[in-house]
Amino acid sequence: MHAYRTHNCGALRASDTGAAVRLSGWIHRKRDHGGLVFIDLRDHYGLTQLVLHPETPGFNVVERLRAESVIRVDGEVIARDASVVNPNLPTGEIEIRVSAVEVLSEAAELPLPVFGEPDYPEEIRLKHRYLDLRRETLHKNIVLRSRVIQSIRNRMFAQGFNEFQTPILTASSPEGARDFLVPSRLHPEKFYALPQAPQQFKQLLMVSGFDRYFQIAPCFRDEDLRADRSLEFYQLDVEMSFVTQEDVFAAIEPVMHGVFEEFSNGKPVSPINGTHTFTNDFGQSFEHKGFERLTYAQSMAWYGSDKPDLRNPIKMANVSEHFRDGGFGLFAKILGADAKNQVWAIPAPTGGSRAFCDRMNSWAQGEGQPGLGYVFWSEDQGGWGGPIAKNLGEPTQALMESLGLGAGDAAFFVAGDPAVFAKFAGLARTRVGTELKLVDENQFKFCWIVDFPMFEWNEEEKKVDFSHNPFSMPQGGLEALETQDPLTIRAYQYDIVCNGYELCSGAIRNHKPEIMLKAFATAGYGPEVVEEQFGGMLNAFRYGAPPHGGLAPGIDRIVMLLADQVAIREVIAFPLNQQGQDLLMNAPANVLDKQLKELHIRTAPPIKV
């Protein structure tokens, strides 16, 4: 017989009745019933109920053991009486009559209970993560993560991709967040950086003649934390040669759809075999298969966000023309003050009560806004109400019809410069959808966001800067960079969004040195800066570079959505807390003076910036 087990704790069934077995595991729960001790024994695979009689050798020892102690038992599989069969447990038809027990490891008093999974402060959970990971929900999340990654790998290999690894110690480069720096002992006063992403290396692989690359890549970014962001994370890093944007979409959509469908527990996933009509910002339309597509401008105008949750059916609308000629004086004044100002409506189907509208107004004030103007429509005499309706009068009916609303509905309004209020309008849309229970949470709704602006105005530095990835190909190429207002240039950049979360960003790359140098010059970076920061890749492009593109879906966020969690820490085995600390390993920590000396480093008090 094996030293520790003949079966795992999730394996035995009624067909095993009468078998002599050996099991090992943790004491999940212990109950004393009339002299008999019942134990739920747990391992990675499941639970099995044990029965110990007073005459069982070691009975007295087991009686005093705490939960989470580790034991080995020998015994016989017996069928449970029909009245005590547990249909919710795979092993619920049997139990083990224990004939011998040995304590393999006795548990001290627990700082964190495992059975029942009661809520506990995150600080305690992270400090004792090895106990937290024994809890069923978190344990399943980590197993799910493993299976999702395996599924992704299989799907990528099936499409002809090869998996390569890229360096962890590399050079610092300005890619949007702060780098984690690693001092070099062999090269005093010089530093490596941990990669924010394998961006340059994966492009260099394409220049090196490889065609379809991927890896499950570790990435490191020294940035402020939030529920869906971590200092270290993993992404499905992808790059392809000789491709257009359409080719990238066609390659990754089956992977994303397939993985979500495989692990969605029956939740519907946006189909990829249907046909959509996409209209770009210039009014040009064409049909395509796959996920729905929105331009960046459309997403901001309709949803107030570049990562819209399309489970919420509310689509905002520009209703400036209803207010431009007066009626509601405040809005007319705002519209007349600046040509770029607009009035947006946030429809609220079924929200046509004064109580709900007042509640939304109070919420807006809590968000630091002066309020939230509204109109609601009813069957009562007059047909409408609210402060805006009183001033607007009869045009209120036309406004209702233009928004596709009717009696029992409402609409909320924001006015001013959309660049300033769009984010708040998006939050209000989300709030309305949630409050009115319009969001269908039982689905995974995907879309592409395309046609991002190549550049944006950096108000702090008073200059044009890159809005996203500086290595993207501008739409229109060199001609656009030389002839267009930089703020009107769009890039071949795209995001995948699911249920309001950005799952990945990607782009068709700028593979021509002359276009790259011009793009960086437009953002205020001279050729010497580009050569210093990106000289390796720029020089490689001078020796024949294929058109290429790629993207990088975030593994942590994918698993977070599939596990129905709201924080990626719930799908990472050993995460940092929101202050960037590892409470289990006590990191970051002080190091020995000897280590600093070897690295030619002297510490100093923090400098206020």
From Swiss-Prot:
Region feature (Aspartate): 199-202
Chief location bin: cytoplasm
Taxonomy, superkingdom: Bacteria
GO molecular function list: aspartate-tRNA ligase activity; aspartate-tRNA(Asn) ligase activity; ATP binding; nucleic acid binding
Keyword tags: Aminoacyl-tRNA synthetase, ATP-binding, Cytoplasm, Ligase, Nucleotide-binding, Protein biosynthesis
Binding site for ATP: R221, D222, E223, E502, G554, I555, D556, R557
Catalysed reaction, written as an equation: tRNA(Asx) + L-aspartate + ATP = L-aspartyl-tRNA(Asx) + AMP + diphosphate
A Gene Ontology term for the protein's cellular component: cytoplasm
Site features described as Important for tRNA non-discrimination, chain residue numbers: H33
Uppermost EC category: ligase
CDD domains assigned: AspRS_core, EcAspRS_like_N
GO biological process: aspartyl-tRNA aminoacylation
Entry-linked Pfam families: GAD, tRNA-synt_2, tRNA_anti-codon
HAMAP family hit by this protein: Asp_tRNA_synth_type1 (MF_00044)
Protein's job: Aspartyl-tRNA synthetase with relaxed tRNA specificity since it is able to aspartylate not only its cognate tRNA(Asp) but also tRNA(Asn). Reaction proceeds in two steps: L-aspartate is first activated by ATP to form Asp-AMP and then transferred to the acceptor end of tRNA(Asp/Asn).
Record note on quaternary structure: Homodimer.
Protein name: Aspartate--tRNA(Asp/Asn) ligase
Lineage: Bacteria, Pseudomonadati, Pseudomonadota, Alphaproteobacteria, Caulobacterales
Name of the gene this protein is made from: aspS
